[in-house]
């Protein structure tokens, strides 16, 4: 697992208040990790701060799983 993946998983676990063991690549934020729309907004803001990047709204809407978050951060 890369450093980026580890950091994304840690951010997601902390932001959604779940154990890092639950944060699997195919986990869906809402269906699997119990997030709501406010959680997702806060998660995007935290990822932007942690990785010093901007996530446009149209891209943020596509980030629905752990893997999609990892892929987005890696692409920046």
Curated annotation (Swiss-Prot):
Q: Per its UniProt record, what InterPro entries does this chain match?
A: ACP, ACP-like_sf, PP-bd_ACP, Ppantetheine_attach_site
**What does the UniProt PTM comment say about this protein?**
4'-phosphopantetheine is transferred from CoA to a specific serine of apo-ACP by AcpS. This modification is essential for activity because fatty acids are bound in thioester linkage to the sulfhydryl of the prosthetic group.
Give the record's family classification. Belongs to the acyl carrier protein (ACP) family.
Protein name, per record? Acyl carrier protein
Family annotation (PROSITE patterns): CARRIER, PHOSPHOPANTETHEINE
For this record, the Gene Ontology CC terms, alphabetical, are:
cytosol; membrane
Q: Keywords assigned by UniProt?
A: Cytoplasm, Fatty acid biosynthesis, Fatty acid metabolism, Lipid biosynthesis, Lipid metabolism, Phosphopantetheine, Phosphoprotein
Source organism, top-level taxon: Bacteria
Describe the location of the Carrier domain by residue ranges: 2-76
The record ties this protein, via SUPFAM superfamilies, to: ACP-like
Kindly list the positions at which O-(pantetheine 4'-phosphoryl)serine occurs in this protein.
37
Q: What is the source species?
A: Dichelobacter nodosus (strain VCS1703A)
GO MF terms on file?
acyl binding; acyl carrier activity
Q: In which pathway does it act?
A: Lipid metabolism; fatty acid biosynthesis
Subcellular location, principal? cytoplasm
Q: Where in the cell is it found?
A: Cytoplasm
Q: Which GO terms are recorded in the biological process aspect for this UniProt protein?
A: lipid A biosynthetic process
Q: What does this protein do?
A: Carrier of the growing fatty acid chain in fatty acid biosynthesis.
Q: Which Gene3D superfamilies match?
A: ACP-like (1.10.1200.10)
NCBIfam families given in the database record: acyl_carrier, PRK00982.1-2, PRK00982.1-3, PRK00982.1-4, PRK00982.1-5
């Amino acid at each position: 697992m890369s450093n980026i993946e580890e950091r994304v998983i840690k951010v997601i676990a902390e932001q959604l208040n779940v154990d890092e063991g639950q944060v699997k690549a195919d986990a869906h934020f809402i269906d699997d990790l119990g997030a709501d729309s406010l959680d997702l907004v806060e998660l995007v803001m935290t990822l932007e701060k942690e990785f010093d990047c901007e996530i446009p709204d149209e891209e943020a809407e596509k980030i629905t799983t752990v893997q999609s978050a990892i892929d987005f951060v890696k692409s920046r």
